[in-house]
Every structure is written in C-alpha cells, then in structure tokens.
C-alpha cells in the first residue's frame, strides 16, 4: 500500500491499510512471499498483460523496448550493485523486449543533475509521515496543489496537467478522479471513520490504476532505552 502500515487506526481499532485492502478485495488474502495477490490466480504469469500493454502503447506510437533511465551516484559500489540487481529484476520480470533499465549516474546532486532537468524515468523514494493521517501520503500525488511535492518534482504529472497531449487524456482523467477522491476525503473533518473510509477509496483507486507503484517498506530497528517518539525527529 502507499500509506505506511501503522500510521493510524479508526475508532473501531482497524488499521488504516486494512481498509484499503478491503476496498481492493484483498482483505481475505495475504501475501505469500512469492506471488502478488492480484497475479496469484494465474501463477504470476503476466504474458497476457504484457501483450496487451505493448499493443496499446504501440497504437500511440511507443516503440520497444522502452528504455527506463535510473540514476545512481557515481563511484558508489553499493549503489551500482543495487542497480544491477534491479536491472536483472526488470529483465526477469518484463523481458528485454519490453522494458530495459538503463543505469545512469550523477556526480553529486540528484536534484540539480537529474530531478530539475527531468531526466529520470522513475524515482524510488521514501516518504515519512508528519502526523497521523492518510493525507500525509496521498496528498503528495494530487493535481492542482503546490504542496503536492511528488506530483511537482518526481513524476512531474502536475506539469503534464498544464497541457496534456491527446494520448495522455486517459491518464490525466485518472489523476483528476484520484485528486477529487482525495479532496473529498480531506474535507471530512468531523467523522474519523468516514474520513479514513474515503481515503481508503482514494488509495485503492490510485493503486488499481497504478498512478504510482509502492516498492517496499523501509523499517529501521534499534535497541534503545530512549522513547523513540520523544526525540526531535520522531515520526509524528
């Protein structure tokens, strides 16, 4: 899910992401460590979906393979090793006839050298909550909001919205619908359960339409006598 687990609970004690799972029809199943829930019925075979995607993209002028630029800092063996594993994952999952990961480098600043000139094909980046509400996460991907950091600086979808091409219409319609759902949820301020249910609908819509794809949860562990939530950089 896009929102981190454990961020917030409704008045019945239900953890928020379980509401998203219910909206997506995944509440009765759990990840088995091998096959994604939505691909489990066919054993993880994406060949039909891949064929459909290539046909639809070819129809609007896309040529294959698509080259995805992924930037890492130059001179870092760890970053290169990680990117090499990711490149192999692309090969194994998509096939080099569909998507090829191109490993590229920046010297010192990903912001100045990659993000600002919009050279990235995608970015793997984390987000931490400032306070315990789903809008912390979902609000980062909306349109028509200068505070939607990811829309403006990572996916650049906010800039696409200013003058979308014909082939981008369906995508922009989906983002507009998602934005409306988030704004409607955020307007509910006197009923916590209704607010979380509405946000869950928005998040499910985002995930089902793959407006963004969650990658992993980064969980840090430490052994300490201090209360982590009493520190200056506590999550919220």
PLM-predicted stretches and their roles:
Residues 1-26, 74, 78-88, 114-236:
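Detector for C-terminal structural segments
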Residues 23, 30-129, 220:
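Ligand/substrate-recognition segments at binding pockets and active sites
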């Amino acid at each position: 899910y896009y929102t981190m687990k454990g961020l917030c609970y409704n008045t019945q004690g239900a953890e928020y992401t379980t509401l998203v799972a219910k909206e997506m029809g995944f509440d009765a199943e759990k990840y088995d460590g091998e096959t994604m829930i939505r691909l489990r019925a066919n054993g993880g075979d994406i060949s039909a979906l891949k064929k459909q995607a290539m046909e639809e993209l070819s129809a609007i002028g896309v040529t294959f393979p698509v080259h995805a630029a992924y930037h890492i800092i130059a001179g870092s063996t760890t970053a290169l090793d990680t990117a090499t594993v990711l490149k192999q994952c692309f090969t194994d999952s998509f096939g080099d006839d569909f998507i090829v990961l191109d490993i590229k480098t920046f010297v010192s600043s990903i912001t100045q050298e990659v993000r600002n000139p919009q050279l990235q094909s995608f970015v793997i980046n984390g987000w931490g909550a400032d306070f315990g509400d789903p809008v912390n996460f979902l609000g980062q991907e909306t349109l028509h909001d200068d505070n939607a950091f990811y829309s403006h600086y990572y996916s650049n979808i906010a800039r696409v919205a200013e003058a979308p091409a014909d082939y981008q219409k369906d995508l922009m319609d989906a983002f507009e619908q998602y934005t409306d759902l988030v704004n409607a949820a955020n307007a509910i301020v006197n009923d916590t359960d209704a607010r979380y249910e509405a946000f869950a609908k928005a998040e499910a819509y985002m995930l089902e339409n793959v407006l963004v794809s969650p990658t992993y949860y980064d969980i840090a562990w430490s052994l300490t006598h201090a209360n982590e939530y009493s520190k200056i950089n506590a999550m919220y």
